[in-house]
Amino acid sequence: MKVVMINDCAFVGETLLKYMSPDIEKQHIKRTRGLWSKTFGLAYKILKAKGDVYHVHYLLQDCYMAARLGKRPLIGHAHGSDLRTSLNHPLWGRIVRHNLRRCGKVLVSTPDVLSIARQFREDAEYLPNPVDTELFYPKPMAEQGEKKRVLIASDSNWNVKGTDIAIRALSKIKNAVDVSIIEYGVDFIRTAALASSLGLRLNVLPKVSHERLNEYYWSADVVIDRFGLGSLGMVSLEAIACGRPVVIYVSSEFPQYKNFPLKDVNTEEKVISTIKEADIKLWKKEYTYLTMEHEVNAVVERLLKIYNISR
């Protein structure tokens, strides 16, 4: 079997290919945000590709091109913003709806968008995101100093990630925490300004490659992800894999998260108390969930079954 992987999101496609059997032939069609790369260049690469299954990340132009070029069987993999935001756009919405109807199978990466996908496809399925355990694995914590080392690891985005909630909460315990933040996201400048106005000092870290993110996780005592969606992001999964407890808003309304130990941490007060209490005991519970639901080989095995059924 030959798998043609098209585009990617948070290295999910790359990780899936990496852990597939050597007996499976693999091709990964990637693109940049350049005009040629994401239009005519992309269409040409898809046209020339020959495979037994085509797996496309995001239900946007990549998926639309593959469908129009007759690539079958076609697996469309939604990653959140395509269903939360693009679906409601006057132009992109038509493309997303076309893809939802034309793909042989639709997958979603988080439970919070599954109900949206099922408005168009009753057979849409949640596939947990895999974690590359060769890159992200536990290391012992360094001895904790007077302050707890907190890393805000997700991109600064107030509407989607709730970064402002994290800043306001941390400012109320600023004498007990040493806060670092990675310099990226549409609201990074606003986030830095808010922290400054509240007297919260931030250690600003440069954005690094995916392969080096583990160093940031290992340097923290607690990792903060997002508070706006109610679902687990890759930041949380990778940080837990690195041996660090994660503070994130996971909604109790999603049965897929029944075994995750933190639920409904979505207010400043809850964020504060969870950061204070976050320790090795919390991490062990989170890590148990991770190994049960996101173990890479199990996710790949499940995906290959979907491929075989779709062929």
Q: What do the PLM-derived regions correspond to, one by one?
A:
Residues R101-K139, G145:
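Donor nucleotide-sugar binding/catalytic pocket of nucleotide-sugar-dependent glycosyltransferases
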Residues F227-G228:
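Aromatic "clamp/platform" in nucleotide-sugar-dependent glycosyltransferases that forms part
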Residues F11, E269, D279-N308:
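A charged, aromatic-enriched C-terminal amphipathic alpha-helix characteristic of glycosyltransferases
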Residues A241, P245-I248:
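Short hydrophobic beta-strand element within catalytic cores of glycosyltransferases
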Residues A43-L47, H89-V106:
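Membrane-proximal helix-turn-helix segments that form the acceptor-binding/catalytic region
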Residues V56-D62, A78:
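Short His-centered aromatic/hydrophobic patch
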Residues P140-K161, I167-K174, V179-S180:
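Conserved donor-binding/catalytic core segment of Leloir-type glycosyltransferases
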Residues V53, R68-T85, L107:
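Active-site proximal beta-strand in glycosyltransferases
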